[in-house]
Each structure stands twice: as structure tokens, then as C-alpha cells.
């Protein structure tokens, strides 16, 4: 009696051998590094939150104070992203198309939120926008309180997310051919028509990408917001600060669940950003 053994073609064996032969030390180091720095912390958070069960997770994630912090965090971050979508586009346009004294200094200042420690940024913003600060004193007579309110949270999120839209747009603006604009003008188009029909369409993907990047950065902001906000529940308390407060109270399950919610939102945003970038590349190729 004969037994037919499974046959593996030489080409498949060669492909497997070639794969293992192609693995190099940099590849191994990269995988280990990413596992330790990115994958394991995320996996630990997800496993910890999953251990509570669906019902326990839902009860903690939907408490009134948690829902209030989601509202403050996500809506304020979205508002900051939309404002920077407009003003960041204007800043990028000026830096690319206009020549003026001190342009390099202004361009370098755009990256200040990247370099400045967030706690220092929060301290500076709270000092400027308090009712006795250089800026806040002009709004105080009208009953407008910026620092230690939700408006202060908005200002901090605008500050830390501005570079994302500017730096995303600048390369696209630099690659736009001015000949297309000149052709539109020669055909009788106004400046507004030229901008709306020739310049603006290629800018839509990077603008949306910049807004998404700024939004995701603002959602996770802690250092600058905690100093300019009053951090009062149901007023201007944001989700990252609530996570820290729960850790201070040794309420690790609540901190884990709220952190998992923020992580889920961040992963969804990363997916959206990747889709927007692919759309932008296809649009540029077309």
C-alpha cells in the first residue's frame, strides 16, 4: 500500500527560502523596535479594557462625565481643525507666494508648537489670555473669558495643531504651476475664478489631510490644555485630563476604558488620513 505525500513544488520552496534569506539585521531590529514601542502598549491597553467585558466597558465609557469630556474634546478639536483649515491655508499661501522681510523667521515660527514644551505653551497661553493678560484684558470688558474656559481649550488646540495644515499645504503650493494661473487670466478669468477653479481643487486633499492631522493631535493634547482650562467637569474638562485624574484616584479601569476610546478614535483618524493621502496622490497623478 502506497501513501501519496503532499507535494511541494521547488518554486514554492525556493520562495520560502528566498524570504528567510532576505531577512536582514535592520529588518529584525525594526520589527522588534515597533513591537516594543507601538504594538505592545496598544495591545496591552486593548487587552486590559477587554477584560472588563462589554457591559462593564460600556458602563464606564458612557458615564455622564465621560460623555461630557468626549463632547468638549472632539467638538473643540474639530472646531480648531476647521479654523486652521482656513487660516492655515492662508498662512501657507503667504509663505509660498509672497516675499516680505522676515519671511524666514515667520516660516520658522510656524514650527514653534512642535518645539515648545506643551506645559510651557499652556503657561504662555494662560498668561496671555487671562483677564489681566495682554490679550485677555481686551475681551474682559465685554464679559468674554478666554483662559480657564472652553474657549481657552479651543485656543490651545488651535495653537498646537496649526503647523500640521501649513506644512501639509506648503509642498503642494510650491508644486503648482503658475502657467495654469496665467492661462486662466489670459482667458479672462478673475482672480477669484482662477483661485476657485484652478488653484483650490488640487489643495482639497492636503487641506483635508491637514485638518485630520490637526484634529488627531488636538484630541490627544494634555499639557497646554490642562494649564489654560479650569478642568471643571461638565464645563471644559477634556478626555486626556480625565484619564490623568482617574489615574491619580487609582481608578485604573476607568482610565483604561477612556484611553481605549481615545485610542479607537485615533486609529480611525489614521485610517482616514491614509485614505485622504491616497486620494491626493491619485488626484495629483490625474
From Swiss-Prot:
<dbReference type="Pfam" id="PF00528">
    <property type="entry name" value="BPD_transp_1"/>
</dbReference>
<comment type="similarity">
    <text>Belongs to the binding-protein-dependent transport system permease family. CysTW subfamily.</text>
</comment>
<feature type="transmembrane region" description="Helical">
    <location>
        <begin position="257"/>
        <end position="276"/>
    </location>
</feature>
<protein>
    <recommendedName>
        <fullName>Sulfate transport system permease protein CysT</fullName>
    </recommendedName>
</protein>
<feature type="domain" description="ABC transmembrane type-1">
    <location>
        <begin position="70"/>
        <end position="273"/>
    </location>
</feature>
<feature type="transmembrane region" description="Helical">
    <location>
        <begin position="224"/>
        <end position="244"/>
    </location>
</feature>
<keyword id="KW-0764">Sulfate transport</keyword>
<dbReference type="GO" id="GO:0015419">
    <property type="term" value="F:ABC-type sulfate transporter activity"/>
</dbReference>
<keyword id="KW-0813">Transport</keyword>
<feature type="transmembrane region" description="Helical">
    <location>
        <begin position="108"/>
        <end position="128"/>
    </location>
</feature>
<dbReference type="InterPro" id="IPR035906">
    <property type="entry name" value="MetI-like_sf"/>
</dbReference>
<feature type="transmembrane region" description="Helical">
    <location>
        <begin position="195"/>
        <end position="215"/>
    </location>
</feature>
<feature type="transmembrane region" description="Helical">
    <location>
        <begin position="27"/>
        <end position="47"/>
    </location>
</feature>
<keyword id="KW-1003">Cell membrane</keyword>
<comment type="function">
    <text>Part of the ABC transporter complex CysAWTP (TC 3.A.1.6.1) involved in sulfate/thiosulfate import. Probably responsible for the translocation of the substrate across the membrane.</text>
</comment>
<dbReference type="GO" id="GO:0005886">
    <property type="term" value="C:plasma membrane"/>
</dbReference>
<feature type="transmembrane region" description="Helical">
    <location>
        <begin position="146"/>
        <end position="166"/>
    </location>
</feature>
<keyword id="KW-0472">Membrane</keyword>
<comment type="subunit">
    <text>The complex is composed of two ATP-binding proteins (CysA), two transmembrane proteins (CysT and CysW) and a solute-binding protein (CysP).</text>
</comment>
<keyword id="KW-0812">Transmembrane</keyword>
<keyword id="KW-0346">Stress response</keyword>
<keyword id="KW-1133">Transmembrane helix</keyword>
<keyword id="KW-0997">Cell inner membrane</keyword>
<dbReference type="InterPro" id="IPR011865">
    <property type="entry name" value="CysT_permease"/>
</dbReference>
<dbReference type="InterPro" id="IPR005667">
    <property type="entry name" value="Sulph_transpt2"/>
</dbReference>
<feature type="transmembrane region" description="Helical">
    <location>
        <begin position="74"/>
        <end position="94"/>
    </location>
</feature>
<dbReference type="InterPro" id="IPR000515">
    <property type="entry name" value="MetI-like"/>
</dbReference>
Amino acid at each position: 500500500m502506497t501513501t501519496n505525500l503532499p507535494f511541494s513544488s521547488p518554486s514554492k520552496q525556493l520562495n520560502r527560502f528566498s524570504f528567510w534569506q532576505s531577512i536582514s539585521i535592520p529588518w529584525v531590529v525594526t520589527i522588534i523596535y515597533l513591537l516594543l514601542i507601538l504594538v505592545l502598549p496598544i495591545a496591552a491597553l486593548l487587552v486590559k479594557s477587554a477584560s472588563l467585558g462589554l457591559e462593564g466597558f460600556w458602563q464606564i465609557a458612557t458615564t455622564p462625565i465621560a460623555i461630557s469630556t468626549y463632547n468638549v474634546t472632539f467638538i473643540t478639536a474639530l472646531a480648531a481643525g476647521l479654523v486652521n483649515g482656513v487660516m492655515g491655508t492662508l498662512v501657507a499661501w503667504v509663505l509660498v507666494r509672497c516675499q516680505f522681510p522676515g519671511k524666514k523667521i515667520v516660516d520658522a515660527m510656524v514650527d514653534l508648537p512642535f518645539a515648545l514644551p506643551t506645559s510651557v505653551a499652556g503657561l504662555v497661553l494662560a498668561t496671555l489670555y487671562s483677564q489681566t493678560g495682554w490679550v485677555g484684558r481686551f475681551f474682559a470688558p465685554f464679559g468674554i473669558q478666554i483662559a480657564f474656559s472652553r474657549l481657552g481649550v479651543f485656543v490651545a488646540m488651535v495653537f498646537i495643531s496649526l503647523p500640521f495644515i501649513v506644512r501639509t499645504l506648503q509642498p503642494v503650493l510650491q508644486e503648482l504651476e503658475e502657467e495654469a494661473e496665467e492661462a486662466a487670466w489670459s482667458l479672462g478669468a478673475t482672480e477669484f475664478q482662477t483661485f476657485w477653479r484652478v488653484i483650490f481643487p488640487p489643495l482639497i486633499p492636503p487641506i483635508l489631510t491637514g485638518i485630520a492631522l490637526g484634529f488627531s493631535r488636538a484630541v490627544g493634547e494634555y499639557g497646554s490644555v490642562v494649564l489654560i482650562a479650569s478642568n471643571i467637569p461638565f464645563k471644559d474638562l477634556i478626555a486626556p485630563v480625565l484619564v490623568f485624574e482617574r489615574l491619580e484616584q487609582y481608578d485604573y479601569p476607568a482610565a483604561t476604558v477612556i484611553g481605549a476610546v481615545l485610542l479607537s478614535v485615533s486609529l480611525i483618524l489614521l485610517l482616514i488620513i491614509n485614505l485622504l493621502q491616497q486620494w491626493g496622490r491619485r488626484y495629483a497623478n490625474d
